[in-house]
Amino acid sequence: RKLIGNKRGKRYFVDYLLSFKNTNLAIVEAKADDKDPLDGLQQSINYAQKLKIDFVYATNGLKIFEHSLIEGNGKWIDSYPTPQELFERKFGKIDTKVETTITYPFHLEDGMKPRFYQQIAVQKAIEASANNKDRVLLTLATGTGKTYIAFQIVYRLFQSKWNKDGSNRRPKILFLADRNILKSQAINQFNSMEKDIVEITGKEIRKRGGKVPTNANVFFAIYQSIAENKKQIEKTQEDEEDDVSGYY
């Protein structure tokens, strides 16, 4: 965590992080058997709040205490719930398509893994999209990797074949930037999806006889290109309406 003056905050560690189907479900605070199992519970709850995790367990190997951040209370339990039980307590009963979308893994390349806040941002956007939310707003500070986060969202929606209508096909996604340099930087971030990408530019539209390119799934453009060719793009959207799951 970065602080003012280019300093870094204290690093936090959890004893155990329980994950299932690419989803972080619970934190376990483990103590020796001669210690009070509730020692450190509040600290783990604080960690869970930062990591957007819904369940915390505190144990000394003899007793187990469960705290649910969903319900806002805790209780002693005889045994841990199964991973599937925790998953269903978090998401409820969901259909296979939604589960595929919200559990699809991140794209990992060259040993680069998303930071915890990037994971949270991506996961929340994915969950909202999978549950048919029409609009999702992510507010992120400078230097937090906004383009990387956008790539991970697009990659997971694309690979899991998420669609607003629930059909089994990849979505069409529009990435908008306000400057060409930002658009170019974004395209570089999306290099692993290169074969599925097309740029929408005035030059490209003129080259195609006034037609907007549609032979791709992920489109990159700047606002000016969209504004200058608004009528043609609207016509293309109408013509392609059966195939388009959404523009973003």
Feature names for model-found ranges:
Residues 197-212:
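Functional beta-strand-loop-alpha-helix junction segments that form "active/interaction loops"
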Residues 1-26, 30-172, 177, 181-197, ...:
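ATP-dependent helicase/translocase motor core
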